Curated annotation (Swiss-Prot):
It is found in: Nucleus. The lineage of its organism: Eukaryota, Fungi, Dikarya, Ascomycota, Saccharomycotina. Keywords: DNA damage, DNA recombination, DNA repair, Nucleus. One of its GO terms (cellular component) is Shu complex. Belongs to the SHU2 family. This is Suppressor of hydroxyurea sensitivity protein 2. Its main location: nucleus. Disulfide bonds: none annotated. The gene is SHU2. Plays a role in a RAD51/RAD54-dependent homologous recombination repair (HRR) pathway to repair MMS-induced lesions during S-phase. Required for error-free repair of spontaneous and induced DNA lesions to protect the genome from mutation.
Length: 223
């Protein structure tokens, strides 16, 4: 990537005040506000502070007595920030829909997908604007195969483990507050993750160690 390209994940990482880790940095927050349309950033921060965001983990190993919550945070750190997870972590990112009777919203930052109406709306708009001769892949995904153009940015990145190419979803075409909120949480820094999950305790990390309960979680999402 060009040196002029903004690395959003590094900006997200600076959201927590360096002098007081119990507060957000107002300067960085104000800067990010103007970088996203439709007040996306404000809505994402509101989501992170709403107590409506959940990370469910199929917990086969880290169900330790006495310190379960801390160990689950360590699992997320290993998976998203240290890359030291020994096995593929099975997790689901869920947002409680504020509309009565509506199913939970499923968010997948790894594949840049959300089941909310906002995501579907802008995805279909991008689809309608696509020329018949254009591939949808080319319209929505930025592919980088020149190592000199590689970026350290992790925001909207697809398949980050590839060594030969980089792929980024064009979030300026399709994005929602749910994807942005979970990206801020999981594609920024350990400090930001712990700020919302431990310090403020607004995002809940929940272990599921029963496969039947894990399957029921998916059924509830579909319903």
């Amino acid at each position: 990537m060009s040196k002029d390209v903004i690395e959003y994940s590094k900006l997200f990482a600076k959201l927590v005040n360096t002098n007081d880790d119990t507060k957000l940095d107002d300067t960085i927050a104000s800067f990010l506000y103007y970088m996203f349309p439709r007040e996306l950033f404000i809505r994402a921060i509101s989501l992170l502070e709403s107590s409506d965001m959940f990370i469910y983990i199929l917990d086969r190993v880290h169900n330790k007595e006495g310190n379960e919550h801390t160990s689950l945070i360590d699992v997320l750190v290993d998976e998203f920030y240290k890359g030291s997870s020994n096995s593929l972590l099975e997790y689901r990112l869920i947002v409680k829909d504020t509309n009565d009777g509506a199913p939970p919203i499923l968010v997948d930052i790894a594949h840049w997908f959300c089941s909310c109406e906002e995501f579907c709306k802008y995805f279909h708009e991008a689809l309608e604007k696509t020329d018949e001769k254009e591939e949808l892949h080319d319209v929505l995904i930025n592919e980088v195969d020149d190592h000199l153009q590689f970026s350290d940015d992790r925001f909207a990145q697809l398949d980050p483990h590839s060594l030969s190419k980089q792929w980024y979803f064009k979030f300026d075409k399709v994005c929602c507050s749910h994807l942005l909120a979970f990206s801020i949480l999981l594609r920024s820094s350990i400090n930001v993750l712990k700020f919302f999950t431990v310090n403020s305790n607004k995002v809940f990390v929940i272990a599921i160690d029963n496969i039947d309960e894990w399957l029921n979680l998916h059924i509830n999402i579909v319903e």
